[in-house]
Structures are given as structure tokens and as C-alpha cells.
Amino acid sequence: MKFTLFLISALFVSNVSYAAVDPEVAYIFNTFLFIFSGILVMFMALGFAMLEAGFVRKKNTSAILLKNIALYSIAGISFYLVGYSLMYVDVGSYIGSLGGMFYNPTGDELALLDGADNVAAIADTGYSAPSDWFFQMVFCATAVSIVSGACAERIKVWPFLIFAVIMTGFIYPIFGAWTWGGGWLAEIGFSDFAGSTIVHSVGGWAALVGCIILGARKGKYAADGSVTPIAGANMPLATLGTFILWFGWFGFNGGSQLAMGSALDVLAISIVVVNTNLAACGGVVVAVILSQIMFKKIDLTIALNGAIAGLVAITAGPDLQNHFTSIVVGGIGGALTTFAILLLDKLKIDDVVGAIPAHLVAGIWGTLAVGIFGKGDFFVQLTGVLAAAILVVPLSAIFFYILKGTVGLRAVSYTHLTLPTIYSV
């Protein structure tokens, strides 16, 4: 019925004997997968920066670029100091241990670097610990990048960077411990292959809270409820950013196979990559069609967000769907995102780049789709979606309100007209 799934099944049930993979060879290929995929995901930081720079007005370009390079750097240090430990070290049902603070390679790895003859002990772990840390860290940075774009053009830089510390050091790792860290959601069978909820919905919930607390940009919404479009300064740059994100997503999803040491692993990665690509295509096509129907013209910003929505939607289950189903999942993600953009305007929630529709809404849909088209239990998937909201929304609100009441969160009204004050504390 489904040729690609048949191939995977055949590898499991075939009576043909396959030579055992040498542990050292598997270690090398698995580690390479983590490093190469991590580099691709790190390149997505540039994609977010270009996308956001294209969507904001010219006077705010430098500020948004500053936030993007700073948040990536903060994510690296926060995840090194505490985030990785809270997410992966001695995780119980809810949170990891601080005993793994100040991440380091394993003792066997350090011994090998010092000249010990313990290759076998290293190879048996399956991959190098530093490569795993790097791969996980760039995912952490992605989550807070979502907040940056949504809250652009009216949030002060320093308060945002303080929130980035909280997001990458605590909020994201705690939810990650519940899932990828083996906590209570993992125990009940929650499935999120590469992070539709763990990365994108978590970032999307924080972005939604931030946009509500900040309020809209000056002039965006009139008292009578009408919307004044605020055009981005550079749509070619936004389009470039979208293509960079699309490119990097092959590492985001493909690397989440977490192994490349066998023919089965490589086949699975190939299927993940194809499904990822097709879902993005589906998101664009559906968004473009809806744009023509709803607005009587094709809107580039809708198309760009359709691509991202398709990518986000398939991220929860690129390993579980066949190719056609991936197009459906991505297409529905593109449709939901298009409708959500209009809904936000109705609610007067000003999301500069469409991050909330493309990451939160599409992320929720993609997570639930695993329970519809994949092997996940729908109600378990729904539990994971709700758990993300229950954790992220109140914590984000608390910290945003603390920042608002202390150092101040929003640039005062006249600073929308003057770039230097955007940098002010």
C-alpha cells in the first residue's frame, strides 16, 4: 500500500542476513550526522535573521540583526551552563539534575584525547557526547528565535536578551526534559520526532505571550478595528531567509533520526528529507491558492509563511507519514497559518513576521497529525500540546511582566521613529 513504509518493514522482516556494523564505523557516521546536521540547523539562525530583517522596517533592521546574533550566543552559553543538564542529565519525571552543569565530554572521551587506548569504550556509546550537545544546543536557539521575530519593532534589546536567558536556560529545557529527556510525556508515549511542539510550539507560546503583553506597534490597529498594513523593508531578504530555513530544515529533521550507522538509518533519513521537502511544498501551494481566493491576489508574505508552516507541521512526524500524507500535513499547516494570520489581526495581536501562526498553530497541528496519520495516540499527543501551553504561558507571562515592571519591556511610542532608542535598556 505505502511503498516507502514497505521498504522499512522489509528491512525488519527480511530473512536476508546483513553484516554487523562495526561499532567504530557506526560511531563515526552517527557523530558526523550530529555535527553536519547541527551545522545546517545553526545556518537556520541566519535564515531567521534574514527573514526578520526583511519583514521589519528599514530603521529597525540593525536592531533585529543584533537580537539574532545575541540570542544565538546566549542560547549557547545558557545551554552549556544549565540547559543541557536540566534537559538530559538524570531526568526524573519532570526535570533533570544540575549535577551536569558546565557540560563536558565524557571521561572516556577525555582519556582518549589524552592518548588512552580505549576506542572500543568510546565506540560503544554510539556517538560523541560533544556532537550530541552541539546538535541539541542549536535546537534550543531555534525556540527563542521564534520569539524574536514576533515581538520585533517594539521590544527593547536588553529585556529581550534577559528573557532569552530564561527561555534557553530553563523554560525550553524543562519541557524538553518531559519529552526528549525521558520525562513523564515520554513515559506515556508522546511522540515529537524533531520538535513541532518541543521547539516550535514552545517558542510560539512564548511569542504569543510576549506580543500580548507588549501590545501592537503604533499605528497598526485603529480604534474602529481596521488594520493598517506595515510593509517590510526588504522582501527579497525575507524570501532568502525562508529558503535558508527550508535548506536548514533538512538537518533539523534529518539529523533527528539520531543515527546514520546502518542502511536502515540512511533509508529512514532519506524518507525524512523527502517528506520534509514535500510538506513545505504543500504548505506553499495551499497558502498561495488561499491567498488568491481570500485576497484576490497572491501575497508573498502568505507564501513564505506557508512554507515555514509546512516545515513546522511535518517536523513532529516526518518519519511516520508516507510522501503523499506529508503533502497533506504541510498543506493543512499552510491553510491553518493563513487563517491564523487573519485571526490575530481580528484580535489585534501584532505578530510582525507571522511566527505565531507558522510555528505555534502549525506546530500544534503537526503534533496532532502524528495521532491521526502516524502511530501516535491522538489524546496523548493532545496532552503534550496542552502541557506545553500550561508550562510556557504562565512562566513566560511572569518573566515578561517582571521585566516590564523593572527595566521596562517596550520602547516608548516615539522610539518607533528613532533606531538608537530601540537599543536602550
Across the structure, where does each feature detected by a protein language model lie?
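Transmembrane alpha-helix boundary signature
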Residues: 80-97, 117-121, 153-154, 175-186
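Cytoplasmic-side transmembrane-helix entry/capping segments in multi-pass membrane proteins
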Residues: 65-67, 156-164, 298-307, 354-356
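Structural signature of hydrophobic alpha-helical transmembrane segments
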Residues: 33-40, 129-137, 270-280, 324-331
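N-terminal secretory/membrane targeting signals
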Residues: 1-20
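Hydrophobic alpha-helical hairpins/lids featuring a short glycine-rich hinge
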Residues: 122-164
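Transmembrane alpha-helical segments of multi-pass membrane transport proteins and ion-pumping complexes
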Residues: 42, 46, 50, 72, ...
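Conserved small/polar residues in nucleotide/adenosyl-binding loops
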Residues: 415-421
